Amino acid sequence: MASQEHPNWLTALLADTRPPPKLFAWSPANIQPKLDEGIDMGSSNSDEEYDNDACVCPSTDSDQRIYIIGPGNIGRLYATHMARHPNALPITLVVHRKELLSQWAACEGVGLADLTSGKIFLNKRFTVEWWTETRPPYGPVKEVADGKKLHNVFISTKAEAGLSEADRIRRYLGRCSSVVFAQNGVCKLWPPHGPLYISHRYPSGDTPTFSACVVSHGVASAGPFLSVHAAPADAYIGPVFWASDPESPWRQPSDDFFIRHIATTPLVNTKQVSSGEIWLLQLEKLVMNAAINPLTALLRYKTGELFTSYGSDDPLARVIDKLLWQTSAVIQGLIDHETSHSVITSYAEQMSQPGTSCSVPKVRKKLTERFSQPILKAKLYAFGLKIFEHRSSMLQDIEAGRKTEIRDFNGWIVDTACFLGTGLDVSVHSGLTGLIERCERFDKMELGRALL
């Protein structure tokens, strides 16, 4: 079978030859004729911490400012704690709807309830903007970053919107820009498709540094600008694509300012890793998401309920087994593919002892074992039982009537199998994608009949 040349998202972007749009940065002042500057935040007590005085005041200095695009649960988590960084920088929250500007004006700021400490962190010392091609009819007229370049961008939207958001702002990105994707799924800028996208959208020598942040913290929404940090965990950050130094083209951006800033942000426990390691971590998280999310959504189960039976007579256990065999085959095929050589080499160099050369074939063999079906199954069952009461994000999306991330989980498996072009069976992933998009609901027996 011949491999597919490009996935649909890349085909659409390659066909788009329009110049990047000029974007206006609306603020609450564009919604209300005058916004009261003095907002009573109340008096603090042992259960509430207000960061009014601790946070850096708003500044027009876009060289230092952090822009968080998509301040949902993960965005609020990082905004809250980046504002408490020992060397805190001014932060702008970029919302996706105009109405959120009015809601921001009326609320007490970003709220993060920490269940471990029992504290509620409240902070209103952020700038909030809505970026649009529409010029505001009244109030101050301001272009994004005053028409200059954005330096520190943290994109924490749903996975589907991540690259489209970065693409929309490419007018304001360049070699000085560091863009971090903190989302589920596998970043679209990895080989094999990322380099072609970059060369199509950016002039040579003016490419931003693009990184991925894999977040394991459990954070739930409790309303607009309010989240609950229910399950503290850890996170990892590493580079995906960067403008190489002609003198040392293989050198990774370990000294990238924004990556270091995130890695030193208190209380989010974000570890800086190599390009190869962050790729593997994204793949491992994808394995969990591609199993747990669609199955819990279709069965309306809590996560742990998926893993109460190993028996071959249980239709759900058989579905999980087959799904993992298919996942394993696709990821192993990707590991062996020539387009993965650079990230495999990055990981091999990280794993090698000082003064010794790395063996890429040996590393590939170890990674093939790491993504074997029995290993993936053991990790999945252990993880699922550990978070037994957890309600997956896809289950919550289905119940709320929202669009899911199924195309970035199981759809990615299907697309990658198509790219590899070796005739791999991905029928379970393809079937799950269709069932989720039709908002089906099954019991275990019905699910087995639909997928086996």
Swiss-Prot record:
Q: Which InterPro entries match?
A: 6-PGluconate_DH-like_C_sf, 6PGD_dom2, Ketopantoate_reductase, KPA_reductase, KPR_N
**What is the uppermost EC class here?**
oxidoreductase
Q: Enumerate the residues binding substrate.
A: 289, 293, 393
Task: Identify the domain of life.
Answer: Eukaryota
Name the phenotypic consequences of knocking out this gene.
Answer: Decreases the production of beauvericin.
Could you tell me the keywords of this UniProt record? NADP, Oxidoreductase
UniProt GO molecular function? 2-dehydropantoate 2-reductase activity; NADP binding
Tell me which residues bind NADP(+).
Answer: 70-75, 405
Q: Name one GO cellular component term.
A: mitochondrion
Asked whether the keyword Oxidoreductase is assigned, the reply is: yes
Which reaction equations make up its catalytic activity?
(R)-2-hydroxy-3-methylbutanoate + NADP(+) = 3-methyl-2-oxobutanoate + NADPH + H(+)
Q: Does the keyword NADP apply?
A: yes
Q: Give the EC number.
A: 1.2.7.-
Q: Give the induction annotation.
A: Expression is highly repressed by the histone deacetylase HDA1 and the beauvericin cluster-specific repressor BEA4. BEA biosynthesis is also repressed by the activity of the H3K27 methyltransferase KMT6.
Any idea what job this protein has? Answer: Ketoisovalerate reductase; part of the gene cluster that mediates the biosynthesis of beauvericin (BEA), a non-ribosomal cyclic hexadepsipeptide that shows antibiotic, antifungal, insecticidal, and cancer cell antiproliferative and antihaptotactic activity. Ketoisovalerate reductase BEA2 catalyzes the NADPH-specific reduction of ketoisovaleric acid to hydroxyisovalerate, a precursor for beauvericin biosynthesis.
Family per UniProt? Belongs to the ketopantoate reductase family.
What is the name of the protein in this document? Ketoisovalerate reductase BEA2
Species assigned in the record: Gibberella fujikuroi (strain CBS 195.34 / IMI 58289 / NRRL A-6831)
What high-level taxonomic lineage is stated for the organism?
Answer: Eukaryota, Fungi, Dikarya, Ascomycota, Pezizomycotina
